[in-house]
Amino acid sequence: ASGPVRRRFGLDDDDLATMTRWVSDSGIRWGYDQAGRAPFALDVEPQGTWRFGLDRLLVGVTVSADGPLQVGGVMPLDDVGSGSVDLVGRVSELLARIGEGLDRLEHAGPATEWMDALTETVLSLTDVPPRERWQVGDLQRTLGSAARHASDEVPLRLADVRVLLADQLAGRPSRASFRTGGLTVCTMTPMRSVP
């Protein structure tokens, strides 16, 4: 998980290791839920989705070791003790916000709606320290610029938004400051003519 996501949900290295184990143990493979698999005609069974894995995790943390083998057709995930309630709650919140973001990005709409949805999704999933808040403003300016370059009369799909944002999010070239007395770290290609 990136730093801003870790900060938003209070995740440390031990939490990430535990989450990785849970993902493996619960059989999560791909797809947020059955609806996310529908375009691939694989929405018959929920097993292997993030939603089903989360259900197993939630049942595992709430049912004791000698409890029922299934609750509502869901087998509890083993080795999820009551001491993990806080982490399970944070994982549940993270996945709920991802699900909300996916819902926002599912429908065609004007560019301004897309940029608002992207901003809301990013802000709900991330938190940056005060000295790095400029990144939030930079994101909003970049998305605003992209929205101004598109017509609000034409509904856009996700693929259209990707194309619209490709140039906006591409890296910006900077002027090289070779031989200015400072330390220059680069690949050999820019310095190939220097003896």
Regions of interest found by a model, annotated:
Residues 1-195:
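Polyanion-engaging groove/track-forming segments
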